[in-house]
Amino acid sequence: MALERLFRRKRPSGGNRDVPELWTKCEACGAQIYKKEFQENLHVCPKCGHHHRLPAQERVAMLADPGTFQETTRLRPLDPLGFVDTKPYVERLKAYQAETGRPDAILGGTCQIGGVPAVLLVMDYAFAGGSMGSVVGEEIARGAERAAEEGRALVIVAASGGARMQEAALSLMQMAKTVMSLDRVWARRLPYVSVLTDPTTGGVTASFAALADVILAEPGALIGFAGPRVIRQTIRQELPEGFQRSEFLLKHGMVDRVTDRRRLKEELVRVLRHLHPGVAYAPGV
């Protein structure tokens, strides 16, 4: 019995439960990736190049010049309709806020991108699927107005499932509001660049995201209005290979360039320096 107790396999103690996982798995190829390498590679799989979703804070750190970002998005959502589905909307909001640390599905502010003054707005898919409700629409409108007033470029990184159903018509009206706000940017002849990431769908695609002077997209991003499953069921036909992915949209003229995330800032700087009226463009930059 003594020998049996000596060699009996011990179960791990509860003290190891708080030790962070060191590895993550690629959603596309299944490769095991060291987490530190994964984060340093901006959540892009080093084996197959699959672009995983990137938190809004990391996206801002990736694009804004160090030390220049000043956050302006502080609005908090309300529940004017008293909406309840399987649970009250206010409870869903509290859960998303606790999970993301954000008041709503957008993070934005003023910054410089490659020395070019800009308003940068990044949608956060982790918050209610990046859905556009009253707060997201208002923050985008205010961001566009700020860009026009201060002579800044406007850069919006989209990641959204579309309009927020819990806000009904109040959500849908944000489509018109965001589009109208862009007029002020264009009136000042300032550049507006849209970056489409996985996924960009619904009312976001059908409004401000598709109206930029230059539209960049990340590789493999799902971009469209309705999803492929809904379209397939509606038209009762098989869809083309890669339908609604960024490479397919590039081929058919909906986006201007598909850019690897690791080179996205470089591409963005080149575009902004070329288009911003207050910045002298240097060939080769």
Swiss-Prot record:
Residues bound to Zn(2+): C26, C29, C45, C48
Subcellular locations according to the entry: Cytoplasm
Pathway(s) the chain acts in: Lipid metabolism; malonyl-CoA biosynthesis; malonyl-CoA from acetyl-CoA: step 1/1
Record-level GO cellular component terms: acetyl-CoA carboxylase complex
ZnF bounds (C4-type): 26-48
Keywords from the UniProt entry: ATP-binding, Cytoplasm, Fatty acid biosynthesis, Fatty acid metabolism, Lipid biosynthesis, Lipid metabolism, Metal-binding, Nucleotide-binding, Transferase, Zinc, Zinc-finger
Chief site of localization: cytoplasm
InterPro entries, per database record: AcCoA_carboxyl_beta, Acetyl_CoA_COase_Trfase_b_su, ClpP/crotonase-like_dom_sf, COA_CT_N, Znf-ACC
Domain CoA carboxyltransferase N-terminal: 22-285
Top-rank taxon, per record: Bacteria
Family, similarity comment: Belongs to the AccD/PCCB family.
Protein purpose: Component of the acetyl coenzyme A carboxylase (ACC) complex. Biotin carboxylase (BC) catalyzes the carboxylation of biotin on its carrier protein (BCCP) and then the CO(2) group is transferred by the transcarboxylase to acetyl-CoA to form malonyl-CoA.
PANTHER family cross-referenced by the UniProt entry: ACETYL-COENZYME A CARBOXYLASE CARBOXYL TRANSFERASE SUBUNIT BETA, CHLOROPLASTIC
Subunit structure: Acetyl-CoA carboxylase is a heterohexamer composed of biotin carboxyl carrier protein (AccB), biotin carboxylase (AccC) and two subunits each of ACCase subunit alpha (AccA) and ACCase subunit beta (AccD).
Designated name of the protein: Acetyl-coenzyme A carboxylase carboxyl transferase subunit beta
